Amino acid sequence: MGHMVNAIAQIDEFVNLGANSIETDVSFDSSANPEYTYHGVPCDCRRWCKKWEYFNNFLKALRKATTPGDSKYHEKLVLVVFDLKTGSLYDNQASDAGKKLAKSLLQNYWNNGNNGGRAYIVLSIPNLAHYKLIAGFKEALTSEGHPELMDKVGYDFSGNDDIGDVANAYKEAGVTGHVWQSDGITNCLLRGLDRVRKAVANRDSSNGYVNKVYYWTVDKRQSTRDALDAGVDGIMTNYPDVIADVLNESAYKAKFRIASYDDNPWETFKN
């Protein structure tokens, strides 16, 4: 999972390095419209924090990269995580942000339901209090006549909150599937795997809410091995080639592989 892919040129760059998924930051204006693909300062060590595009322009380029037959098509790119920077919004704007985000995606990515981009989408929300963004998103797609597109949409609360609190937020949001649980910290700092293991245990329990667990931001071979040993489903990185190298090591290549479009990202993998 390629981290902080905010310029159109970076889509090709990260997929060519081995990423089958990218993460893109989405900033909002004061009226809760998705405005830019932009992270800003501070960001990960050894990365330029200020690359950006207008959100709708990025979506159009992403559509080309994920539409079979297009000259820019990458068969390998199957999942996009939108890191929604909702910290600039009031809590009562969350539903509006979801509606406006859905309409932008419908028009510019899904091409109004007519042979749009095929990648699966994860809406990653940093604040549990913004759970109404999910209902707003679903409501907009339904009112625009495309509720079937929700089959392509999953969810993540990215604030490293207590697993029980995250479960309650999903209950409030009415979400019962398509859940990716993230855990992590900037590559400038160290973070243990305790919460990852709790998320994995939730995923593997009979009554958990988690379908997939991913860990960020992992740039070193040893931390990649540690995350794989903990049982994660995905690893977000600034260096997709490092992850690909580790997956080819004898200890891992029989147990893990890069997911393809035929793999269901909402289905919990049972080994």
UniProtKB/Swiss-Prot annotation:
Its cofactor is Mg(2+). GO terms for molecular function: lyase activity; metal ion binding; phosphoric diester hydrolase activity; toxin activity. CDD domains: GDPD_like_SMaseD_PLD. GO terms for cellular component: extracellular region. Glycans are attached at N248. Mg(2+) binds at E23, D25, D83. InterPro entries: PLC-like_Pdiesterase_TIM-brl. The active site is at H3, H39. Its EC number is 4.6.1.-. It comes from the Eukaryota. One of its GO terms (biological process) is lipid catabolic process. Expressed by the venom gland. Its main location: secreted. It catalyses: an N-(acyl)-sphingosylphosphocholine = an N-(acyl)-sphingosyl-1,3-cyclic phosphate + choline; an N-(acyl)-sphingosylphosphoethanolamine = an N-(acyl)-sphingosyl-1,3-cyclic phosphate + ethanolamine; a 1-acyl-sn-glycero-3-phosphocholine = a 1-acyl-sn-glycero-2,3-cyclic phosphate + choline; a 1-acyl-sn-glycero-3-phosphoethanolamine = a 1-acyl-sn-glycero-2,3-cyclic phosphate + ethanolamine. Belongs to the arthropod phospholipase D family. Class II subfamily. This is Dermonecrotic toxin LarSicTox-alphaIB1c. It comes from Loxosceles arizonica.
